[in-house]
Amino acid sequence: MLVALVVLFLSVFMAMKFLYKRIFVASRLKMIEKPSEDWEPASREAMIERLRSEVFDLVVVGGGSTGAGCALDGATRGLKVALVDAGDFGSGTSSKSTKLVHGGVRYLAKAVSNLDWSQYKLVWQALGERTTMFEISPYLTNSIKIMVPIYSKILIPYYYVGLKLYDWISGFKSLGKSYFIDRKEAVDAFPHINKKNLCGAMVYFDGQQDDARNNVMIVMTAVCHGAVAANHVSARSLMIEGGKIVGVRCRDEITGSEIEIRGTGVINSTGNLADDLRRMDDADAREIIVQSSGTHIVIPKEYAPKEMGFLDPLTSDNRIAFFMPWMGKTIVGSTDIKTKTELSPSPTEEDLEFLIHEVQAYTSMHPKLTRDEVSAVWTGIRPLVKDPDVSDTGSIVRKHFVRIEKNGLLTVTGGKWTIYRKMAEDAIDLAISAFSLKPSGPCVTKYVRILGGDGYTKNTWASIQKELGVPKNVAERLARSYGTRALRLSSYIKKNRKKVLSVKYSYLIEEVEYCIDNEMAVKVCDVLCNRLMIGLMDVKEAYQCIDKVLGVFKKKHGWDADRCNREEADAIRMLDKYGLQILRGCGQDASSLQMECPEEKRHRGERRLPPQEK
């Protein structure tokens, strides 16, 4: 009887707490203004001036997924938030993922095999956040089937039970129930699968996203709700007065000017560089980041099953690799190699050859995949977290880590893309407590859609096609990229009459101008790699687009020849991070690799690849 009363009391208490929170959140949401359809951010110059002259509740350093999430969470709680990033928003690890929104089947396998409750909690939490991301980023996420090949009948029960457990943990958040297909069905779905000893396959459901654009749109949504943000602004030192952090000294990487940004609290969301900023707070701080590089290659769509992904359950280095359809291509990755601190790493020959070998091992295409078919290769660094108070590395997991450092720096790191919103919520909760901030309400980011998400449906492309007068395939891509905000392209198209940026991928010149005005793109590489994604898909095509993108910037901002030359050089250096250096020459005659003067290449309307470095 006593136990029953205790259970009843706890149930009523939890129900009342839940109801109170929902009512509180609902009242706060009513206070938050819906963004107007014609909203666009202030100019970069205006943002920089505000960073110089105002005092903020929070200064967030690092504009990847977690930092962007912190800016949005803080702004929607009524806090005054500043956000800076040394490069472009999300241009580091956050744009170089496998594009999955997932619980993590490998973490579930570890949870079962090692009886590890922390891994189980990680999966359960991530599956909940997957559902939330589908709600708040509707046009940048989608569900996808993933095939897991089985080459031994003994393993069929293992994969069947494991993926059914994944379904069960998903519960009402499930995107679909996993199922078994026999050998014939597996071959029908993926004609080029390695058929030797193939017994069949399991198919399960998970999520996929456009990570780079999602990151950018989270930042834009934060700015729309009052945050002040600037990309290409690097943190150089912390401002410490009386043993307390009062701001960040930064450098504007565009103009070279110094900026002091003052704030009650500073959040370190710099990912794999978190230890660098922690040592600015405390020179003796023990490292918490173990860096692991992950490389992906982009190859033709034929190397993945029809309308589904493919999971290589055991690579030659005892990991798993995904073959995921994405924007008419296939992404394959990733590697897992311990690495050093680096803001934007370049892919290596070893990574490229390893991934080509993995594709060759799991496909039966003849001839086998060659370097000529690789259109891009890029590397990101996972910020794996270890406990600074534990000397061994056994504590390294994918959970996130939030703590206050010696002089008050708040560090949030670890985790993964799928749980960025929860990481940000935990960081802002701690910031409010640690810095005695006064928010106007609780966290509401579970219910705040990114710009372009309100009113979006699967048929939004039809409205875009009607309004812009573009072919169906272009309208569908615009809907998937911009959501309902694609309709804002109308005024740009009327002005420019639908000029083509890339015939190969149906990108429009108008999109470049739109991204400059509406998405804070300030450099050529911002457009090519983090807004239009051409660099991520096809690095040589991105190289060919440099002049056209440069032309739009020159016309809008009046760039002189010196600035244009610097931007061109910066863009080429950035494209090297997407494989331009190690892929150049593939499938081309060596004579075509000679440099041309700008006048000659513009006269020809085509750029020749620069010579390969020795």
Swiss-Prot record:
GO cellular component: mitochondrion
One Gene Ontology biological process: glycerol catabolic process
Region described as Disordered: 595-614
Protein name: Probable glycerol-3-phosphate dehydrogenase
The reaction(s) this protein catalyses: a quinone + sn-glycerol 3-phosphate = dihydroxyacetone phosphate + a quinol
Keyword Flavoprotein assigned: yes
Compartment annotation: Cytoplasm
Enzyme kind, highest EC tier: oxidoreductase
Source organism (scientific name): Encephalitozoon cuniculi (strain GB-M1)
Pathway as given in its UniProt record: Polyol metabolism; glycerol degradation via glycerol kinase pathway; glycerone phosphate from sn-glycerol 3-phosphate (anaerobic route): step 1/1
EC annotation from Swiss-Prot or TrEMBL: 1.1.5.3
Pfam family, one: DAO_C
UniProt entry keywords in alphabetical sequence: Cytoplasm, FAD, Flavoprotein, Oxidoreductase
Positions with a binding annotation for FAD: 57-85
GO terms, molecular function: glycerol-3-phosphate dehydrogenase (quinone) activity
InterPro entries for this protein: DAO_C, DAO_C_sf, FAD-dep_OxRdtase, FAD/NAD-bd_sf, G3P_DH_FAD-dep
PANTHER family: GLYCEROL-3-PHOSPHATE DEHYDROGENASE, GLYCEROL-3-PHOSPHATE DEHYDROGENASE, MITOCHONDRIAL
Names of required cofactors: FAD
Compositional bias annotation for Basic and acidic residues: 598-614
Family according to the record: Belongs to the FAD-dependent glycerol-3-phosphate dehydrogenase family.
